[in-house]
Amino acid sequence: MKGISKILSASIMVMKLGNVYSAVPLCSNTYDPSQQQPSYVLIPSTPEAITNCAYSPKNAYVPSSPTTSSSTPGTNNDNETSPTTEDVGTCKISVVKHCDTPGASSTPCEPEQTIPAQPVTMATVTPAIIASVQTPSVVSVIPVTQKVIQPATMIVPPSSIIPGYYPNGTPAAPGQQGQILSGSVLAPGASSCQLVPGNTPGQMLPGMTPGVSPCLPTQGGDGSNQTIPGIVYPCQPGQGGSGSNQTIPGVISPCQPGQGGSGSNQTIPGIVYPCQPGQGGSGSNQTIPGVISPCQPGQGGSGSNQTIPGIVYPCQPGQNGDGSNQTIPGVISPCQPGQGGNGNGTTGQPGQCVSVPQTPNPIAMPPISGISGNGYPTSTTYTQSLGQLGPCIDVQKPTSSCESQTNEKSTMQYAMEACAAPTPTVVIGNSEYLVGPGMYSSLTSPCNSCCQC
C-alpha cells in the first residue's frame, strides 16, 4: 500500500546506513509467535511508558537523555506523511516500519524512503538508546600482519636418527621405526619404550625412562597408557587386564563400564566421578566434600539425589515415589510433567510441586470481537482514541498535573499501520526492536507515565 506513514529521524537514517538492527524483544509476546502479526507499530520512546510491559523492567527502554529533534507533520496528495518526529517533553515518538506488500515479507521491513549515501560519523549519533544494544561507531581498521612461522629449533639429520624413532613426527607403523613428537629430541643412547617380544616399538616422550615407560595403546602389546608428569590416559576396555586407570597425583580418569570389576570410580581428594548404571552395585554416587553428582534412574533404590549444602539436583520422573523435588534453602528445581499433580514449579513449599497462578496478560486487551486472528487488536478498536489510522494524527492529551514539571506538550503524534507481516518492529532512536501485543497498551495513552509526581 502506497499511503503508509513514514516518520524518520536523523537517527533512523544512521540506522539504515549502518544497518543497525536489534533482535532484543521490547516486551514478552504472550501469543503464538508463528501467527501473522502487524509489520510495525508506533510506541513512545518514554521509559516509564513501557517499563511495566509484561512485568519485565529489564526490557524497558531507558535513555540517558531525551532527543530534541522535532518538526511538523503533514500530508501530501498521496496521503503520505512527511518525514518528521515530534518531541513531547520526555516522550519523543519514533516510528514506524512497514511492508510493501501485506504478508509478503519474513524479514524486518525497510523504511519506504530512499536515503542518499553520506558518510556516517560519531557526530551524527545523538539519540539515547538501550545500553545493551549496539550503536554505530567508527571502526578502526587493523592492518593484517602476516604470521611468521618459526622454523624448527633443531633438525635431526638422517645420520643422527636414533634406532626406533623418526625425527619428523611420523607415527610408527609395523616394521618401521617409532616417532619423536614436535620439539622433542631423545638423548643420545635412548632406545624405544618398553616392548613386548614380537611387537613394534612404541612412542616415548621426554622424561621417560627407556625400557621402562609403557607404550601408547596398540603399541607394546598390552595396550597400557604412556604417562608423563601431569598427564594420564585412561585404559580402554580390554586393555591392561582389569582396565583400571593409571593415575598420577592430582589427575584421575573414571573407569569405563566393565573395567575395574564393579565399575566404581577411582577418586582422589577434590575430584569425584559418578557411577554409571550397573556400576558399584546400586549405582549410587561416590561423593567427597563439596562435590555431588545426581543419581541416574534406577540407581540408589529410590533414585533420590544426594545433596550437600548449596546444591540440589531434581529427581527424575518415577524416582522417589511421586517425583517431587528435593530442595534445600534457596534452591528449587521445577517438577516435571506428571509430577506432584499438575507438574507446575514453585518456589513455595520445599519438596512438593504445587500449582502457580497463571500471570494474566497485564495489558487490558479489547473485547474478543476487537481482536484479529493474529492476536493483535484490530485497527478499528483504536479508532476512538487514535482517529484515522495510517497517516499521522494529532490527538489532544488531557492536561496533566505534572505538566509544569515535565514541560509536556499538549499535542502528540503517533500512527499505526498493520500489513500482516510475520514480525512487528518498532524504531527507537537508531535501533529496531521486535515487539509483542502488549506494546499496544502504549498506543491508547502513550505518555501516561511520563510524569514523576
Curated annotation (Swiss-Prot):
The gene is PTP1. GO terms for biological process: sporulation resulting in formation of a cellular spore. Residues 61-87 are annotated as: Disordered. The lineage of its organism: Eukaryota, Fungi, Fungi incertae sedis, Microsporidia, Unikaryonidae. Residues 214-333 are annotated as: 6 X 20 AA approximate tandem repeats. It is found in: Spore polar tube. The keyword Signal applies. Involved in formation of a polar tube through which the infectious agent is passed on to the host cell. O-mannosylated. O-mannosylation has functional significance for the ability of microsporidia to invade their host cells. Coiled coil: none annotated. The keyword Glycosyltransferase does not apply. This is Polar tube protein 1. It comes from Encephalitozoon hellem (Microsporidian parasite). Glycans are attached at N79, N225, N245, N265, N285, N305, N325, N344. Residues 63-73 have a biased composition (Low complexity). Sequence repeats lie at residues 214-233, 234-253, 254-273, 274-293, 294-313, 314-333.
